[in-house]
């Protein structure tokens, strides 16, 4: 399932979802009503977005992957709240920020576990990929844990594209821009892992993403 700038409440029960956010400012609410593991992924472009995820029953499992390209003239803001209100739930969130130019990036995420819940777990991983000489990065992870017998963890990575991989690809005949594009294309491809989507539509989104990257890398 795919939607664009859909601010209405999303109820996840039996279908994984990809959403495209572009030139949007507002809030998205997601309610977990699933018993089988699901995935929510989103490409977040030029957007000031707040996402609230709430469990609606015990036993819900969700994998979230958010890809956020950031450019100089459009500072990005992303604020995610993971509210685990029931026992035996699991939410794993990964935020990848691709900083394409001398840009400002602000991403914050909160894991909140209510009193009394048991055997729930949540992890937050924030990755910042620096594709420019100077960047302004502000990540604000918050763990609000009010219960025992649960698991919560946070991790962060800041890195540049792998120079050894770039050199290897160039040794195989690619020029520097082609090698860079090949490495970067792996990030939007991860959006569609576990998502039912037509190959043509997936390739179009990846192509548009790479065009966006080229325009802001020039």
Language-model region placement:
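Conserved beta-strand/loop scaffold segments within soluble protein domains that form the structured core
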Residues: 1-167, 171-172, 190, 196-218
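Small/polar glycine-rich anion-binding or flexible loop at a beta-alpha turn
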Residues: 183-189
């Amino acid at each position: 399932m795919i939607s664009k700038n859909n601010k209405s409440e999303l109820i996840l029960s039996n279908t994984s979802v990809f959403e495209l956010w572009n030139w949007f400012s507002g809030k998205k609410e997601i309610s977990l009503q699933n018993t089988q593991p699901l995935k929510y992924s989103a490409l977040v472009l030029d957007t000031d977005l707040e996402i609230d995820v709430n469990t609606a029953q015990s036993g819900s499992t969700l994998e979230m992957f958010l890809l956020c390209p950031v450019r100089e003239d459009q500072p990005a803001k992303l604020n995610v709240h993971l509210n685990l209100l029931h026992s035996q739930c699991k939410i794993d969130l990964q935020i990848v920020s691709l900083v394409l130019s001398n840009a400002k990036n602000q991403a914050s995420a909160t894991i909140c576990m209510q009193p009394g819940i048991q055997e729930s777990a949540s992890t937050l991983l924030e990755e910042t990929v620096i594709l420019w000489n100077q960047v302004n990065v502000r990540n604000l992870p918050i763990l609000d844990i009010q219960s025992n017998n649960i698991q919560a963890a946070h991790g962060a990575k800041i890195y540049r594209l792998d120079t050894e991989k770039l050199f290897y690809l160039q040794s195989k005949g690619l020029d520097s821009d082609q090698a860079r594009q090949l490495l970067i294309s792996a990030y939007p491809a991860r959006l569609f892992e576990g998502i039912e989507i037509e190959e043509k539509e997936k390739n179009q989104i990846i192509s548009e993403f790479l065009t966006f990257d080229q325009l802001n890398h020039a």
